[in-house]
Each structure stands twice: as structure tokens, then as C-alpha cells.
């Protein structure tokens, strides 16, 4: 029985994680979780799973729930996330919060000796050098929840990582993959949130459309697998059936295929190196796909991906700037303050004005993050 701590329980990844826990009560127990603003959903999770500790974002929600569930310990805010992440009785932390707010709880959980299943890619983007060093010192493996990185992990099982020629991350191309740059000037939030293959949260769906999401995944792969940026390639795979591939020095490829269902990588992170069956509505049959299509990425069409590669290669605090600027720009788009077409421009503006600080400590990363957010907000 693995005792699970789940950060971001009411989001897309969190909700699907709860499905896995619900379907495997003999394998998993939810002992602590966090949620943001959806108190009705949070209340329902408490009633169903009966956790010992819960973190909410707002003080008023903590006060409300404390009166309803006197046997549960409640915390709120970032401090609450950090308390829950290190809950003594938890075995595994699955971090599914969105944004750089997930960094400190992850570092705390590593220090506390928890196994880490990481869906919060911003943690590695902003502080990969600190996180990987901390995990190494504690002899803790970070198991990826992203479908692409889970695919790479599976492709590398039993392989010598020194024999990697290239990591190939696949991308659907997002909701606007067939539109020109000129056509993007008129797109709406509603249109942007229609992903062709995956069911994801709003922020992630927009990031998929710009391909900032794939850029963050490139940086994540760099840290998780120790591969240089020049040896990480992104290709468009329209069907989202091939989740990613590894090319080896002998020219062979190992790929992981499967239905575009996030339960698969989530469950694999929780059961690694074991596997459990998953009840699908429709069985995946490879013969249903008479052809799989692969295309090179047009970096003029998707400048966000080029910005991400540049930020990763520059290193230091530049990935923090890219991530923080993108979070504010996407929030501005979702709130109607920014045109979709201008998301990349805002990020590029923030990067151009920043001089990267090499090998930053945690305080520097947090300071740069806040300064970048404040600056981009002035541009909305």
C-alpha cells in the first residue's frame, strides 16, 4: 500500500490521479492533498477519501472546512502546500500543481525523503540544477508524469544512457497547428481551449497551442535524462499515439505508443517499475491506425519553442524568466487582456531585458521569478 500525497487534486492531472487511487484501493491510499479555489470539489474529495491533512489556498476556505471536518488538519497558502508535501505518513508526493509555486514543496519533499512523481514541469524548468542535486544527495528518483517523459523513461529501461544519440519528443501541434501566423491574430480563448487529442487544464492547453509547453518539456528532459539540448529534438506527431522516442548510437529507435490518456503515465509513475491494468472505454488497437504522421517543427510558425531552446541553452535564470513571463502572458490571454498572437512577444520582451545569472541559488530564482511577473503585468 502506497500512501499518496497529491498536490493539485482538483486539476486535470489531480482528478485523473484520484481515479487511479479510487480504482486501486488495495494499492493506494490518499493521505493528504491540496487544492486551489474549487472548495466544492475539495470538500467532495475529503468526504470520499478521508485524508488526514489538506492544504487550501485561501484562509476563508481553510476556516470553512475546519468547522466541517474537525478530524482533518488544514493549512493554507504556500506554507500549506509545503506542510502537506512533507506529511510524515506519506510515501509518494505527486506534484500536479500548475506553475512555479510547485518548486518549494518539491524541494521540501525531497529533503523529507519522499518519492517524487513530478507533473509540475516548472519545478525543473526554473531550478533543475537544485532539484536534481537535492534528489541525488537523498538518493531519490524523480519519476515523470508527463506522457512524453514517461515514454522516454520506458524506452530507456535496461539501456545504457551513454548510448543515447538523441531524445525525440513528440508534439500534437496544439489546437492551431494548421493555422498560419497571420490567422492567429483573431483566435479566441474558446477556440484555443479545444485541444485535438488531449484532455488538459486551460493553462496547459494554451501552452500546447503556442508550444511553450513543449519548450518546457525540452528543458525538463534535459534535467531528467542528462541530455544536451542539441540532442533533444521535437517532431509533430498529429495522432498523439507515439508519445516519444529514443534514438541510439547504432541508429535504432525505441518508442512508446498508446492511447492519449493521462492515466497511463500517472499510474506508471505511481507503480514504477511495475504496471497495472487500466480500464479503457475502448481498447487500443494498433491496426486502427493505418498511418502515423511525423513532421518537422517550423520554428517560424512556433517561435515559442525556439525561445525555450534559447533559454535552456543560456541557462541560469533565463528559464525562470521564460516560465514566469509565459504564466502571466497566458493568464492575460485567458482573461481577455492579451491577444493570443502576443503571448510569445511578451515572453521574448522579458527575456531580452534580462541578463542571466549563472548557477543561481533558490533566493535568486524566487526573486527573478517575482520581478519578471511584475514586469510582464505592466505590459498587459
From Swiss-Prot:
Binding site for NADPH: 10-13, 36-38, 120, 122, 201
GO biological process, alphabetically ordered: isopentenyl diphosphate biosynthetic process, methylerythritol 4-phosphate pathway involved in terpenoid biosynthetic process
Catalytic activity entry: 2-C-methyl-D-erythritol 4-phosphate + NADP(+) = 1-deoxy-D-xylulose 5-phosphate + NADPH + H(+)
Listed Pfam families: DXP_redisom_C (PF08436), DXP_reductoisom (PF02670), DXPR_C (PF13288)
Enzyme class: oxidoreductase
E.C. no: 1.1.1.267
Cofactor: Mg(2+); Mn(2+)
Binding site for 1-deoxy-D-xylulose 5-phosphate: 121, 147-148, 172, 195, 208, 213-214, 217
Gene Ontology MF terms in the entry: 1-deoxy-D-xylulose-5-phosphate reductoisomerase activity; manganese ion binding; NADPH binding
The keyword Cytoplasm belongs to this UniProt entry's keyword annotation: no
PANTHER family: 1-DEOXY-D-XYLULOSE 5-PHOSPHATE REDUCTOISOMERASE, 1-DEOXY-D-XYLULOSE 5-PHOSPHATE REDUCTOISOMERASE, CHLOROPLASTIC
Similarity comment: Belongs to the DXR family.
Job of this protein: Catalyzes the NADPH-dependent rearrangement and reduction of 1-deoxy-D-xylulose-5-phosphate (DXP) to 2-C-methyl-D-erythritol 4-phosphate (MEP).
Protein name: 1-deoxy-D-xylulose 5-phosphate reductoisomerase
